[in-house]
Amino acid sequence: MTWVTIGLSAGTLLGMAIVVSGVFGWANKLFQVDVDERVLAVIDELPGANCGGCGYVGCGEYAEAVVLEKAEVTLCTVGGPSCAQAVAGIMGVEVSAVLPYRPIVHCGAHQEDRLGRNEYRGEMGCAAANLVTDVQGCTYGCLGFGDCSRACRFDALQVVDGLATVDYEKCVGCGACAKVCPRNIITITPFKTDRVLAVSCSNKDKGKDVTAVCNVGCIGCGQCARTSRLFKIENNLSTIDYEAYTADCLPEVLAACEKCKRQRLVFVGKPTPEDLEKTKDEELPDVVAPAFRTTVDDMEWRG
């Protein structure tokens, strides 16, 4: 191989590289999609959790929806009010006060409170157990196998003594727990105060049927509704009008709590200093981490 041949080869490759680069550059200009700079600015203000709590797949899609589709700027529960204000500033819109949304577990029955429980030997998940009859007497209450806990990316929900329990110090209100609950006992509710009242039951059967399957379930007696305008009995179950719920309602709410025979009206949310002081010496129940085992795992194979 002579230097002439080497030079021709190198020149040919260089020429091809220049041509291909030119083609790629032309194609890049031809097929370029202009991105609104506001989309990038909104993405920078979002927390990047990609939790889906806003109703979109991720932060990028939500940012595009805000800029291009005029979606609400207050949908990011992880970012909270400060994020909403920043996004509103980019979009040149005003935003009113943003209430934090948090989950409420509408069940208060721990293991010993549930009647009619039977041994379950299937897949240790709520979705699977919900397909099986006679897992427990109550067909409305928490199954306690932890689908909600596993769905939470912020470690804000654990199963304690068979009952899904929210850590409101960690919770950001993304709603992942509510989406995976097969019994729909978790609702995402606006918290007008750090602590709100909740009905910790979902059973819509008549009172005598409730007492047959649960020691603590709401029997729909109506005492709360007769005590406070915030309550209403619907389908044998006490409900709360959260639109009318404010801090000023506390006296009548406390009166209703005293009237509740089954003590199903409970306050949920961040603990107060008084609560922490009262419970500092109490021993906490064990946190249950369900094992993913079925009867097949314990089967002894022979042959």
What would you call each of these model-derived segments?
Residues T2-K170, A176-G222, T227, C257-K259, ...:
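Ferredoxin-type iron-sulfur electron-transfer modules and their immediate structural context
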Residues S228-Y245:
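Short recognition patches in nucleic-acid-associated and regulatory proteins
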Residues Y245-P251, A255:
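Polybasic, proline/glycine-rich intrinsically disordered low-complexity segments
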